[in-house]
Amino acid sequence: SEQTGAHAIFMKGHNHTDKIADAEAELEVARAIADNGINVTLTPEGDKYTMYATNVKINKDGSKKYKFAEGLMATYTYEQKTPTEINSSAESSVRLAINHANDKHAQIALIYDKHSLFHTKDIENGMKLYQSRHKAWKTKGVKAVVVISSKKILYEHHFDE
């Protein structure tokens, strides 16, 4: 980033989604994180890159299924969601983003609010909703929710004890 000196690295082997809009959102978020002074690395995914896997499931037949987070933010893994609309409620959308990040054993649930759908209260209430439905939330991987606004401003939210 010319603004902060932080960098966004795109490692060879990083699989962008088949949806062009989602791939563009991943790149926009990586640049926005760097513009906010945090180094970010989009890590590779797939069978050749299992060392970057954040979760491994062993199937009944002994085969392994690897899951990969989006990348590293500083030294934390994150998984990104870019909602284009709110289906049931903003709070539920936040809870689902946290579940998605936990499924991949990421430490940060990152929400790219490209379409200005969320307010601070939505994020806080979504985190509380997640905590109320998952009693063992402290032992899960996600430690924070980071929101990148449509203006590329980074907001960090932590769980209440």
Residues of each region from the PLM?
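Terminal amphipathic helices with adjacent charged low-complexity linkers/tails
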Residues: K65-Y66
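Conserved catalytic cores of phosphodiester-cleaving nucleases, focusing on short active-site segments
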Residues: G71-T84
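Metal-dependent nuclease catalytic core centered on acidic motifs
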Residues: S1-Y52, K57-G62, P83-E161
